[in-house]
Amino acid sequence: MKLEDTTILITGGSRGLGLALAEASAKTGARVALVARDRTELDAAVARIRAAGGHAHGIVADVGDKRAIHRIAGEAAAVLGPIDVLVNNASTLGPTPLRLLLDTECEDLERVLEVNLVGPFRLTRVIAGSMALRDRGVVINISSDAAVEAYPSWGAYSIAKAALDHLTRIWAAELVGTGVRVISVDPGEMNTRMHAEAIPGADPATLGDPVRVAAQIIAMLRDPETAASGTRQVAASWEVPR
């Protein structure tokens, strides 16, 4: 897929992997829409991309709020053009320190599901139709190794990510023949604020670099043969793009 002059919408785009991917996307010549809740962080991210010569637009919104979904998709398309790539990256751990399921409030589980699962479903549902009409598009759902491992105290997050992986497979099966690919990406443990909140004592030197993972995702987008629709891609197993 040629990324120059495409529109890429990235949720959770103001920091971590989302920001790294937004910067990498802009460097390819893509127009990038970043979605985040914090206006200050979002404005700083957009300014950083523009200062480097990229084309970026920020949208302050919470993907866990169903009232924001149509506004996100509509504003991104109105300002930057039809969306070619959707990256469902926004995520929440729930309350930290992380809790065992016995200590997890139903409301906290509901919030994690709204952001990590229902939000991606809603955005994909709004955007994938227009992608199919143009016979092209990619949806990337950012997953986690917690989706396939039973880590104590990661229950709410793990449940949401496991469901997101299966949602990816169902979307892919239902969109066969439309030109739209839907892929899960497990980026692995990365040196991000979110990881530090989950595991405060982790050694940053042992964690992955969001910039490297972003470069790998860009390489995957450029070459559709590297990731079939409906697959779960694990960043740790990818070769480093040159």
Show which residues each predicted segment covers.
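The beta1-alpha1 cofactor-binding region of Rossmann-like NAD(H)/NADP(H)-dependent oxidoreductases
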Residues: 39-40, 60-72, 106
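Residue(s) in the substrate-gating loop at a strand-loop-helix junction
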Residues: 144
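Conserved glycine-rich cofactor-binding loop
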Residues: 12-15
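Substrate-binding pocket helix/loop in short-chain dehydrogenase/reductase
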Residues: 97-101, 105-110
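Alpha-helical segment proximal to the catalytic Tyr-Lys
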Residues: 129, 172-174
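C-terminal helical subdomain
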Residues: 177-180, 184-185, 192, 200-242
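Active-site helix of classical SDR
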Residues: 124, 160
